[in-house]
Amino acid sequence: MSAALGVKLPYDAFRDFALVGLALTSCNFLAVRANNKAETLGEVIALAKAKPGQLSYASQGLGSTGHLAGELLRTMTGIDIVNVPYKGGSEVITALLGSEVELAFVSATTLKGVGVGRMKPLAVTCARRDPGLPNVPTFAEAGVAGYDASFWYGLLAPPRTPPTIVARLNSELRAALADKAIAQSLETQGLIAAPSSPEEFTKVIRAGFEKWKRTFAGRTDKIQQ
């Protein structure tokens, strides 16, 4: 997705790789401190509209999944919230709990670990609820229709890999992700098995490229190289 954010890359995702298949998806959660009066995403949006430019959210850095999720929320709702980029997830946690920011995008493992009793998740960035935290609504359910800032992991091969080899790799990937023990292990890490065909994987990448290009159109944020 870096290319969609204006970063010049030495490769082309479609030309320089053979796309084998989508493997996993994962989500972030928009969270506030446990003592925050806001109980819903709608309340946060209302507050942000009442106080433009005064609410800030912590992300794991410019161009990170948290930054993308925050910018998508900003563009889809018209609110003015400020991204405060930190160097990784641990700094994001410290910033939120230390009251440096009002909001943060954090992982499921954070909420089920250090965040227990200290953070309050308001919405999950995926289009579907996270099976590990099923009581947290999606952004769409919370009032932002069409919102989806899930991120994914996929398998790629060198360019010009023979189609028969790509098909075999895809088959093996599907078999591995169908294993219940593997799926359960992944779920504890906030990862959801989402195998696809090479063609479906191509569509996912292209759709994501266009979405993030639209989201960041006109932005001057310097994305990490």
What are the language-model segments listed below?
Residues 4-91, 139, 152-185:
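Hinge/capping helix and adjacent helix->loop/strand transition within the periplasmic-binding protein
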Residues 8-10, 14, 25, 110-177, ...:
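C-terminal lobe and pocket-closing loops
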Residues 29, 102-103, 121:
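Short, Asp-centered acidic motifs that coordinate Mg2+ and/or phosphate
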Residues 40, 85, 99-100, 113, ...:
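Conserved functional loop/turn residues at catalytic and ligand-binding sites
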Residues 71-76, 90-101, 112-118, 205-208:
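Short helices/loops that flank or line small-molecule/ion binding pockets
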Residues 76-77, 163-225:
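An extracytoplasmic/periplasmic, membrane-proximal ligand-sensing/linker region
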Residues 86, 105-106, 124, 196:
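Short beta-strand and adjacent tight-turn residues that come in two discontinuous sequence segments
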